[in-house]
């Protein structure tokens, strides 16, 4: 088995090739990629938690250090100016010495402003990639060379195709997230509050709240009907009926994004609904293959939701086909099937059809779908169908010609459980689909 160092070396070669291509296409000499800067809280002397530029961590697994800079030209060894000030107020990261540093020219940067003296004087054909546009302007970059859209489009498009190094990192992130999910399930079983379940997850994964790739969703009972619920109640409800956890982890800057739903009563109707949605999710994954458009699988999932609505007597007197055609499945599954995953949880280029940035929007019927790409080998995506009981979405259906098909008594009986979401992370290969999540036996 190849070591992470050898995989990184191959990864770097791929990035160098992409850099040569994009520089040649846009008549540039180099890219200057900025890790980012600390952002000060308004009227305060503290900063927001630092979040690194994803284009920076694509090159080096440095995720917590601001004021770092990468100079890449696709030919010479990438040069990293690593921010290493003399500071007794804050901890300072030592110069890195790891599996990746033999391939990078690492130089200390004692003061953030010193970067101006380190760069070549002639920068007319250099593009700045980062979010500190005022800093780029101060360094003399013209507006057209600050995050030029054609360059970003190219870089974003090819980020969809993960290298072996990236896939190895994402599998490690999966392992960490699975450990956290198991700890959270045990906390739920013991009757803990949302707040304490979240602490159990963070403890098991070794993450802080600011380290996880997105805000953990830890929802008991009807809270799981809020798609991005992040309140974290400190006290458990008087009766615990259900538990939804949508939580991930990071490894070298790469994300995992997993969701599971559980019920306290394994013999309840809601438990049967969880089991059947799990079956349909796995069955859908079994049909996924390279060369097909992701949008088609989203539509297929709505057909499977219609099947569940019929078999669980939630919608009656209308065919499954008509349910999908009339949009009856939409209030039960209001979000997309999933999204690209990688350096970002909602990774780039979900709608991009080529490296020139050609966009294909989600269908108007399914506006929250986050990916319209044709699936190809090395893409990593989430598959996360849900089935929810959301008052605001169901309310319009209580009147009108289709109201008679909704079993409102049964729907209202399930509303206190909130909803279900089951999410796995998959890798597209030439002849198969790898389910990184299920490979780790997370049921």
Swiss-Prot record:
The free-text note explaining how the cofactor binds reads: Binds 2 manganese ions per subunit.
Q: Which residues bind Mn(2+) 1?
A: 257, 339, 384, 423
State the UniProt keywords alphabetically: Dipeptidase, Hydrolase, Manganese, Metal-binding, Metalloprotease, Protease
Instruction: Give its E.C. classification number.
Output: 3.4.13.9
GO cellular component labels: cytosol
UniProt cross-references to PROSITE patterns, sorted A to Z:
PROLINE_PEPTIDASE
Keyword Manganese attached: yes
- InterPro entries hit by this protein: Creatin/AminoP/Spt16_N, Creatinase/aminopeptidase-like, PepQ_N, Pept_M24, Peptidase_M24B_aminopep-P_CS, X-Pro_dipept-like, X_Pro_dipept
Q: MF terms per GO, please?
A: aminopeptidase activity; metal ion binding; metalloexopeptidase activity; phosphoric triester hydrolase activity; proline dipeptidase activity
Which top EC class is named for this enzyme in its record? hydrolase
Required cofactor names? Mn(2+)
What catalytic activity does the UniProt entry give for this protein? Xaa-L-Pro dipeptide + H2O = an L-alpha-amino acid + L-proline
Q: Which GO terms describe its biological process?
A: proteolysis
Amino-acid positions noted as binding Mn(2+) 2 in the UniProt annotation, renumbered to this chain:
246, 257, 423
**What family is this protein classified in?**
Belongs to the peptidase M24B family. Bacterial-type prolidase subfamily.
The role this protein plays is:
Splits dipeptides with a prolyl residue in the C-terminal position.
Name by which UniProt lists this protein = Xaa-Pro dipeptidase
Q: Tell me the organism.
A: Yersinia pestis
């Amino acid at each position: 088995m190849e070591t992470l160092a050898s995989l990184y070396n191959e990864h770097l070669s791929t990035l160098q090739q992409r850099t040569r291509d994009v520089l040649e296409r846009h008549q540039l000499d180099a890219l200057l990629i900025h890790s980012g800067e600390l952002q000060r809280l308004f009227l305060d002397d503290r900063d927001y938690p630092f979040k690194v530029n994803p284009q920076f961590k694509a090159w080096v697994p440095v995720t917590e250090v601001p004021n770092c800079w990468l100079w890449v030209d696709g030919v010479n060894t990438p040069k990293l100016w690593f921010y290493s000030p003399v500071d007794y107020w804050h901890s300072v990261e030592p110069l890195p010495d790891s599996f990746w540093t033999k391939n990078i020219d690492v130089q200390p940067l004692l003061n953030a402003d010193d970067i101006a003296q380190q760069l070549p004087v002639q920068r007319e054909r250099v593009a700045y990639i980062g979010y500190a546009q005022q800093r780029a302007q101060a360094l003399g970059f013209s507006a057209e060379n600050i995050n030029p859209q054609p360059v970003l489009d190219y870089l974003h498009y090819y980020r969809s195709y993960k290298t072996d190094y990236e896939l190895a990192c994402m599998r490690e992130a999966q392992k960490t997230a699975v450990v956290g999910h198991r700890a959270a399930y045990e906390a739920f079983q013991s009757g803990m509050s949302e707040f304490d379940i979240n602490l159990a997850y963070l403890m098991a994964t070794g993450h802080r709240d600011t380290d996880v790739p997105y805000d953990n969703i830890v929802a008991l009972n009807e809270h799981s009907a809020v798609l991005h619920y992040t309140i974290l109640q400190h006290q458990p409800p008087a009766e615990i009926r259900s538990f939804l956890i949508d939580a991930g982890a990071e490894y070298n800057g790469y994300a995992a994004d997993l969701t599971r739903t559980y019920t306290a009563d394994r013999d309840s109707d809601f438990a049967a609904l969880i089991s059947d949605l799990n079956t349909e999710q796995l069955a859908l994954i079994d049909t996924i293959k390279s060369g097909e458009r992701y949008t088609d699988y989203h539509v297929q999932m709505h057909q499977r939701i219609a099947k569940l609505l019929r078999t669980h007597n939630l919608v009656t007197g209308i065919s499954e086909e008509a349910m999908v055609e009339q949009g009856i499945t939409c209030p039960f599954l209001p979000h997309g099937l999933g999204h690209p995953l990688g350096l970002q949880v909602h990774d780039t280029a979900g709608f991009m059809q080529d490296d020139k940035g050609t966009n294909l929007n989600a269908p108007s019927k399914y506006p929250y779908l986050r990916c319209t790409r044709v699936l190809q080998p090395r893409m990593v995506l989430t598959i996360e169908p849900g089935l929810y009981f959301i008052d605001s979405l169901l309310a319009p259906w209580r009147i009108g010609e289709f109201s008679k098909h909704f079993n409102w008594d049964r729907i209202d009986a399930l509303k206190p459980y909130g909803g279900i979401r089951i999410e796995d992370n998959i890798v597209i290969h030439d002849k198969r689909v790898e389910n990184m999540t299920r490979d780790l036996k997370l049921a």
